[in-house]
Amino acid sequence: MLLFFAFGATHTKGGSSNHAALIEINGVIGEKDEVNAKDFFESIQRAYDSRGTKGIILKINSPGGSPVQAGMINDEIKRQKKLHPHIPVYAVVEDICASGGYYIAVAADEIFVDKASIVGSIGVLMDGFGFTDTMKKVGVERRLMTAGSNKAMLDPFSPVNSKQQAFVQEMLNQVHQQFIQVVKDGRGNRLKDSPDTFSGLFWNGEAAIKLGL
């Protein structure tokens, strides 16, 4: 759904008049970051506890972050929806709803975007650096002792181990498949069949609508 909006809703605290409760999901997702499961659990519970709540709006502006925290938030939204099936949940995207942000959004009944919003990035990322060549050039020797053959896996000062690299890639693939399934469960038959949908690409809001995102 395409939405051209100037958003200015507020969360009604404890009032009895009919209203839509607003929950802001703004920033990076992580246990110690702006968006985290603990704070969200408290916010959504207050929203449902507020008398007169007729709907819940998730105002999302997030590039993503922890898949664990995003998954916990997604699960909590779905849990609350089962308890309160008469209260719809809407995700309203501002500038960006990518990766973990989108992981959260798909738990909503409907997703609204601006035509220029950034949406998608359904993928998993793990990055790092390698300093082995630099160490050789400056004459630095790495002295590393471990108990457990894989304890120093992905150590940036050691050469890449192909078996360990394959292990990590498989782990990332598994998390990616979990993400894909969550999107499919949330969007259902609205998703269009495209090889790019789950590739990690992102789109503007207008294009995302055509893909069923």
Write out the residue ranges for each language-model feature.
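Secondary-structure end/capping motifs
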Residues: F179-K210
